[in-house]
Amino acid sequence: MRGKEFWIILAVVLILSAIIIPIPALLLDLLLTLSITFSLTVLLLTFFIKNPLEFSSFPSVLLLGTLLRLSLNIAAARRILLHGHEGTHAAGKVIEAFGKLVAGGDVVVGLIVFLIFIVINFIVITKGAERISEVAARFTLDALPGKQMSIDADLNAGLITEEEAKRRRQELEKEANFYAAMDGASKFIRGDAIAALIILFLSLVGGLLIGIGIRGMDLASAVKTYTILSIGEGLASQVPALLLSTAAGVLTTKMSSRENLGEAISEELTKQPRALLFSAGVLGFIGLIPGLPTLPFLAMSAILAGAYYLVQQSLKERELKELEKLAQEKTKEKEEEGEELIPQPEPITLEIGYALIPLVDESQGGQIPKKIKNLRKQIAKEYGVIVPLIHIRDNLRLKPNEYRILIKGIEIDRYELMPGHYLAVNLGNAKGPIEGIETYDPAFKIKAYWITEDKKEEAQKLGYMVVDAETVLITHLSEVIKRNLHELLTRNEVMELIEMLSKKYPKVVKEIVPEQVPISIIHRVLQNLLREGIPVNDLLTILETLADYIEQTKDPDLLTEYVRQALSKRITRMYLTNGTLYAIALSPKVEAKLVKFLKENREDEFIDYVLNTLLPKIKNEIVKFAQYGAVPVLLTSGEVRRFVRKTIEPYLSELAVLSYNELEKQVNIKIIGIVDED
C-alpha cells in the first residue's frame, strides 16, 4: 500500500473512532480547528483552479469533510451532555468562544443569530449549490453525445490526431463523472445542515434535562450554560459547512478558462469602466439627499470614482502594449517577406463540391466521416500499415456533385456523384440492359449506370451490383489509398511499426534494427511490397529475412525478392481461386531471351522487347481469366520477375507478376496461356 493511500485510510478510521470513543476537550479543540482549516483551504483552492476537472476529487473531499464534521458534532454533543454542568469550558475553548461571541451575553440573541446563520447556509448557499449541481449534471450528460460526435468529426476531418481524440474522450468521460458525482455530493451538504438543527435541539433540550434533573443546576444557570455550548457547537460545525457549501457552488459555476476566478471576475468587471463612473454618480447623488447619511454614500462614490480612474489608466496601458505588439508583428512580417515556409501537403485529401457537403456533415446525417474511420481501420488491419488521417474540405472550383482525391497534394482521380441515385455496376454477369444514366465505376473503371431507387430491385435481379453514392465514394477512396500505400508510407511510420513490434519481440528487434538493417532499407522494401499490393502485416518475418540476406546484398529491390520468397504462403493465397492458382506463363524461349538481356546489361533492348513484343500478347492472354473468375497472374522466373513487373506496371497495373520461387510448394497451378514471341 502506498503512503498516500495509507494516510487517507488512517484519517477515515480516526474520524469514525471519534464517533465511538470519548475525546478530551483539548483534542476536540484541535479537531474543530482542523475542520475549519480544511474547509477554508478547499474554498481557497476552488478560487485558484482554472478548470473544475483540476479538482475532480472534490466530491470525495466533500464527503470526508461532512463525515469529519458529523463525527465532531457527536463528540461535542457527548461532552456537552456529560460535562456541561462543569461550565461553558466543558466542551473546549473553541465551542465556548463561538457560543459567547454570538450570544454576546444574551442567550436569546445567540439562538436567533444562530438560526439566521442556519437559514442562510441551508436555504441560500446549500440549496443553491444543490440546484446548480443538478442542472450542471443534467446539461453535461445531455451534451455528451454531441461532444463525442464533435470529437469524431474533428478526427475524421483530420483536425486532430488519434492521441488528441483519445485525450478529449477521456476528459469528456471525466467531466461527466465529475458532475454526476457533484449532483450526489450536494446532498451531503443539505443533510449536514438539517443534522445541525437536530443536534442543536437535542444538545439544548438534553442538556437542560440532565443539568436540572440530574446535576441539580438551577434553571437560569442551566439555560445559559447549555445554550452557549449548543450554539458554540453548532457554529463550530456550520462555519466549515458554509465554507464547503460555498466551495461547491464556486466549483460547479466555474467555467473552464485560462484564468483563476479572481482574475476572471476582475477582468470582466473592469471591461466596462463607465459602469463604475455611473455608480459613483448615483451614490454621490443619494448622499446629497436630505435625511440620508451623507458620509458613507459620498465615501463609496469617491472610491468608485478612483477605481474608474485606475481602470481607465490600466486600459490605456494595455492598448499601448497591444499597439506595440502589433507594430512588432508587422515589422517581423516585413522582415520575413519572401521567406515564408511552404506548408507541407496533407498525405490524403478528399475535396468535395458544395452539393456533397450533406454526405460529410454528420449533423445532417452524413455517414462519410464514420465510414472513412472504418476504412482506415480496415486497410490498417489488411495491409499492416498506419493509414494517415484523411482531410476533408470543400472546393468551390469543383462541380456541385464532384469530388477529387489527392495524395500529397497531387490529384489522383476525380468523379461526379449523383446523390439520391444508385450506381448499378455490370461485373460481367448482367443479363440485360438497365434504364439509367450511363457512367462508369470510379474504383475499377467498369461500365455502370446511375439509376433511381425504383429501379434498384430490377437491377439486382438482372445481376447488377447496386450501391449508393456514399459507398461509391468510399470504395473509390479505398482503392486509391491501396494503390498508393507505398507513397503514403514514410520512414517515420516505419519506425512506429517497428516500435510496436518491439513491444512484443524486443530482443529480436533490438538485434536487427538498426544494427544489422538500417531503417532506409526496411522502408524501401516495405514500399516495394506495398506497390504490388503485398501486405506487410508479418513484419517480424520481413525483418528476420532482411537480417539473413543483408550481408549478401544491400540492394533493396533484390532484398525484396528474398522477402517475397519468405512470404510465399501469404502471396500465393492472395491469388487463389477456389484453391487453384490460374496463371499465364512466359515460354522458355522468352525467359532465356530476357535473362540474356539482363546478363549483358542490355536494359534498353529488354524494355523494348517487353513493351513491343510481349505486352500485346500478354493483353491477349489476360482475357482468359474472366471465364475462371480469377485474378490475372503472370508467372516468370525469379531472375526476371521484378524487371518484367516494373516494365509493364504502367500499362497493366492490375496484373500480378509472380515468380516460381515465391509460390507455395503444394499449390495447385493451372496454366491457361503461354506468352511467346511467335
UniProtKB/Swiss-Prot annotation:
| A cellular-component GO term for this protein | plasma membrane
Ranges that cross the membrane: 8-28, 29-49, 57-77, 105-125, 194-214, 231-251, 275-295, 340-360
According to its UniProt entry, the protein's GO biological process terms are:
bacterial-type flagellum assembly; protein secretion
The family this protein is said to belong to: Belongs to the FHIPEP (flagella/HR/invasion proteins export pore) family.
What membrane topology does the UniProt entry give? Multi-pass membrane protein
InterPro entries the UniProt entry points to: FHIPEP_1, FHIPEP_3, FHIPEP_4, FHIPEP_CS, FlhA, T3SS_FHIPEP
Species:
Aquifex aeolicus (strain VF5)
UniProt-listed Pfam families: FHIPEP (PF00771)
Q: What does this protein do?
A: Required for formation of the rod structure of the flagellar apparatus. Together with FliI and FliH, may constitute the export apparatus of flagellin.
Listed NCBIfam families: FlhA
User: What does the UniProt keyword field contain?
Assistant: Bacterial flagellum biogenesis, Bacterial flagellum protein export, Cell membrane, Membrane, Protein transport, Transmembrane, Transmembrane helix, Transport
Q: State the source organism's domain of life.
A: Bacteria
Query: What is the protein name for this chain?
Result: Flagellar biosynthesis protein FlhA
From the Swiss-Prot or TrEMBL record, state where the protein is found.
Cell membrane
